[in-house]
């Protein structure tokens, strides 16, 4: 299923590990990144901007690192 704007998504930890994005940032990921669901607020190319239900900035992740939450 293709991810689109407004979808609720989960981050796939295995796909994020050792990716370029993971190597460029702190490896101590906050728990909400994998335990919660985020909302896709924008999509540009292969990346989606995700807003989580906690008071933090949005994050950009590759679409293949995300899955639609059930």
Swiss-Prot record:
Spell out the subcellular localization from the entry: Cellular thylakoid membrane
Molecular function (GO) terms listed?
oxidoreductase activity, acting on NAD(P)H, quinone or similar compound as acceptor; quinone binding
Q: Which reaction does it catalyse?
A: a plastoquinone + NADH + (n+1) H(+)(in) = a plastoquinol + NAD(+) + n H(+)(out); a plastoquinone + NADPH + (n+1) H(+)(in) = a plastoquinol + NADP(+) + n H(+)(out)
Question: One matching Pfam family, short form?
Answer: NdhO
Keyword Membrane present in the record's keywords: the answer is yes
Keywords recorded for this protein, A-Z:
Membrane, NAD, NADP, Plastoquinone, Quinone, Thylakoid, Translocase, Transport
- EC number(s) per entry: 7.1.1.-
From the record, give the cysteines joined by S-S bonds: none
Q: Name one GO cellular component term.
A: plasma membrane-derived thylakoid membrane
Transmembrane intervals: none
Q: What is its main location?
A: membrane
InterPro entries, per database record = NdhO (IPR020905)
Q: How does it sit in the membrane?
A: Peripheral membrane protein
Tell me how this protein assembles: NDH-1 can be composed of about 15 different subunits; different subcomplexes with different compositions have been identified which probably have different functions.
Q: What does this protein do?
A: NDH-1 shuttles electrons from an unknown electron donor, via FMN and iron-sulfur (Fe-S) centers, to quinones in the respiratory and/or the photosynthetic chain. The immediate electron acceptor for the enzyme in this species is believed to be plastoquinone. Couples the redox reaction to proton translocation, and thus conserves the redox energy in a proton gradient. Cyanobacterial NDH-1 also plays a role in inorganic carbon-concentration.
Give the family this protein belongs to, as stated in its UniProt record: Belongs to the complex I NdhO subunit family.
Q: What is this protein called?
A: NAD(P)H-quinone oxidoreductase subunit O
């Amino acid at each position: 299923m293709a991810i689109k704007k407004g979808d609720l998504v989960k981050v796939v930890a295995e796909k994020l590990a050792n990716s370029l994005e993971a190597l460029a940032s702190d490896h101590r990921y906050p728990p909400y990144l994998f335990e919660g669901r985020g909302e896709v607020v924008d999509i540009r190319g292969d990346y989606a901007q995700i807003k989580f239900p906690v008071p933090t900035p949005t994050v950009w992740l590759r679409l293949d690192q995300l899955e639609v939450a059930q």
